[in-house]
Amino acid sequence: MKKIIFLAVLLCVSFYGFSQDPKYGVRTGYNISNLDFDGTPINENKHRNGFMIGFFGEYSLSKSVAVAPELQFSAEGAKREAFKLDYIQLPVMFKFRISERFALAAGPQAGVKVHKTEDGIKNFAYSGVAGIEIKISHQFFADARYTYGFTNIFEDYIPAEAINTNIQLGLGFKF
């Protein structure tokens, strides 16, 4: 956990020197999450509704390209209690402005599971994230993202495979 926080701070500080107009902010939103099983699910597999909250730095690399490292809490997984997975995540989004109000974003994400640590589910998760951002005003924005897990959530000794998928609908404020 300390390593992820240190990495987030290091990313924010290191990009500060490259950026022409750094922005910082917070975002929060609603998650619709599910586990995508390879084959037949172990149990009934219903999606989980949850929330996310976090903060970010956004650093312009050019007029139309920016990088935005984030640190967020995200409630994901599935509805069944054993599959409720909460993560502290570090997405690094590369944003491509396509107009004054719209931007496309994509990037990698690493996550550390919080709460239960020895439950047969891996403590680290790696994902890809893609989405769109809509500028509401100079400071407010809305976004929609899709997260696709790259790694099996189960430990190697569990005879099942599943990845975490997530739709995020968010609102944010830039300082």
Sequence positions of predicted segments:
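Repeated loop/turn-to-beta-strand initiation elements of outer-membrane beta-barrel proteins
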Residues: 22, 64-67, 101-104, 134, ...
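Residue-level signature of outer-membrane beta-barrel architecture
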Residues: 57-59, 96, 112, 134, ...
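Bacterial Sec-dependent N-terminal signal peptides
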Residues: 1-27, 171, 175
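Membrane-embedded beta-strand positions of outer-membrane beta-barrel proteins
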Residues: 26-28, 69, 92, 106, ...
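Glycine- and aromatic-enriched membrane insertion/assembly motifs of diderm outer-membrane
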Residues: 42-80
